[in-house]
Each structure stands twice: as C-alpha cells, then as structure tokens.
Design a protein with these regions (language model features):
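A broad, low-specificity signal marking well-ordered, structured residues that form hydrophobic/aromatic
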Residues: 41, 49, 88, 187, ...
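Loop/turn elements at helix/coil->beta-strand transitions in domains of secreted/extracellular proteins
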Residues: 4-5, 86, 219-222
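Generic structural signal for secondary-structure transition and capping sites
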Residues: 12-16, 40-41, 84-88, 149, ...
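Juxtamembrane helix-loop transition sites at the ends of transmembrane segments
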Residues: 34-37, 89, 105, 154, ...
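Aromatic/pi-system hotspot detector in well-structured domains
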Residues: 56, 107, 216-218
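Catalytic loop of the DD-peptidase/beta-lactamase superfamily, centered on the K-T-G motif
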Residues: 19-20, 27, 64-77, 81, ...
C-alpha cells in the first residue's frame, strides 16, 4: 500500500515518470489520475526510488481530502502568507498577471529566443505549479534553515531533511565529483554529502525556458537560490561550483570578491545551450 511518505519521498514503487508524457500532451490532471491504475510497479512501495510528477501531485489530493481546502489555498495560507512571500502564486494566469514576470527563453542555435508559457505543468501544482520571485525564495530558504519555526518547526524540518530512500548519482542527476556521496531523497528534497560536510539539501526545477536551483545546509547555515528565465548549461555545475567557492572562502583569508573573480569564466564560456 502506498503511503503519503512514499509519495513525498519518490518511493511509491511505480514506474518512474508515470504519465509525465501526458502532462506534456496537455491532458488534464483528473484524466491522467484515472489512468494511474494501469501503471506497473517496479518494486514494492518504499523499496526503490523513482521520480514522479503526477504521482507526487497526489499529495494535493490528500491535503484537500484532509483539510477541505484545495492545495493552492492551503499552501498560500500556511506558507506564502506567514513567510511574506508576497509575489508567490499558483498558475499561469497569476504568472502573466504579475507585471514584473520574467519571460522564458530558449536557445535557437545562434541566439536566445522568447518562448510561450504553457499551462502544462501548472496542472500539477504540488510538482511544478508555483511562481515566485527571488525575494520570495529567499524567505523560503530562511525558513528551511530554521529561521521561521512557527511555520516550519524543527521537528518538521528534521523529518523533511532526513534520508528516506537512497539514490544513485545518475538518479539524482549529479555528475561524478570528488567528495560527493550519500545521495538520497527525503520528503520533497534531494540530499547529499560533499567533502567533509554532510547534510546538504537540494532541488532543481525545469520547465521550457526556465531553470532554478536551491541548495542549503542547515548545520552550516548557508545556502543559495538561483533563478533564470533561460536554459544555460552551466546550471548543471552551479550547485557544486558554489560549494567549492564556499569551502575556499571558509578556509581562505582573501576577500570574497577575489575568490569570486577567480571563479569567473570568459564570456564565451559563461552561457551555452542545454542539450536535449
């Protein structure tokens, strides 16, 4: 039997990315859910990792069934409002209504071109339906670091940030890197150790023309959020480049700006298209 914990830890046992193709085809969430009984199990629930979008979004149905409030309303009231995430919202309409929204861009082979924002992933809010500014994400980062205990208690954070199911580097979408180990998935978060430090928490996001990365370490009280309305390939190295710079900063007596300049690449290397 699949539990809420299985859903949140991507360990339902179902075939990975079940019906993500139907999300891409713009099929409604309700229609997709009715087909989930056709999806095969690759292991018993809790026994293996398999990333999901549609299956993860069943969390929203659980919230609605237990609170009488839809997922969007529940998160707005319990998270966005108390954390003062003033521009955070759900849905394509809210995104387009924000006068300062960033338009997505894709690489054509010679230049970046603006592309259309679609409804596809907005149909599964728990997995991919949130809009937020960098200021909003800063508040979310601080809450994850334990600075908003009324909203996210220490016990809640500890449970979210603890390993539930082990993952391989490939499953975690990490390249081999010296010092990287103990990759796992908690409740909605990827987890890893790096170098001498344990307990890093991470997740990235991608929809056409947009990328995001958020990583932090509660024990070290450090973290980063990066949002871009494009698809630069350097995003794949961003988290670990940041950690290398952070480690050097901790060990060095040089000013931070000197270290940062050392990490900058020539302009021709800074932005290249993401391969498909």
């Amino acid at each position: 039997e699949i539990s809420l914990k299985h859903l949140m830890s991507q360990s339902s046992g179902l075939m990975p990315h079940a019906y993500t193709n139907l999300v891409e085809d713009n099929m409604s969430y309700d229609r997709i859910v009715k087909r989930l009984n056709r999806v095969d199990f690759i292991c018993a629930p809790g026994e293996c990792y398999g990333y999901q979008n549609v299956v993860f979004s069943l969390v929203g149905d659980v919230v609605a069934a237990n609170t009488g409030v839809d997922y969007e309303g529940f998160v707005t009231r319990k998270t966005f409002e108390p954390l003062n995430m003033a521009r955070a919202s759900f849905g394509r309409a809210a995104f387009l209504d924000d006068p300062k929204h960033a338009r997505p861009h894709i690489w054509t082979g010679s230049h970046w071109r603006e592309t259309r924002t679609t409804d596809h992933y907005y149909r599964i809010p728990p997995a991919a339906g949130v809009n937020a500014s960098i200021e909003d994400m800063t508040q979310w980062l601080l809450a994850q670091l334990g600075h908003e205990p009324v909203v996210l208690s220490s016990d809640m954070l500890s449970e979210m940030h603890s390993p539930v199911i082990r993952t391989t580097l490939r499953q975690a979408h990490y390249k081999r890197r010296r010092g990287l180990g103990n990759t796992a998935y908690g409740l909605g978060w990827r987890l890893f150790d790096y170098g001498e430090d344990a307990g890093f928490v991470h997740h990235g996001g991608y929809v056409k023309g947009m990328r995001s990365e958020m990583m932090f370490n509660p024990r070290l009280q450090t973290g980063m959020v990066f949002l871009t309305n494009s698809e630069p390939s350097q995003m794949n190295n961003l988290v670990f480049d940041f950690l290398d710079l952070y480690r050097e900063f901790r060990q060095s007596s040089e000013p931070a700006i000197v270290l940062m300049n050392r990490y900058q690449k020539p302009a021709s290397q800074q932005v290249t298209p993401v391969g498909r």
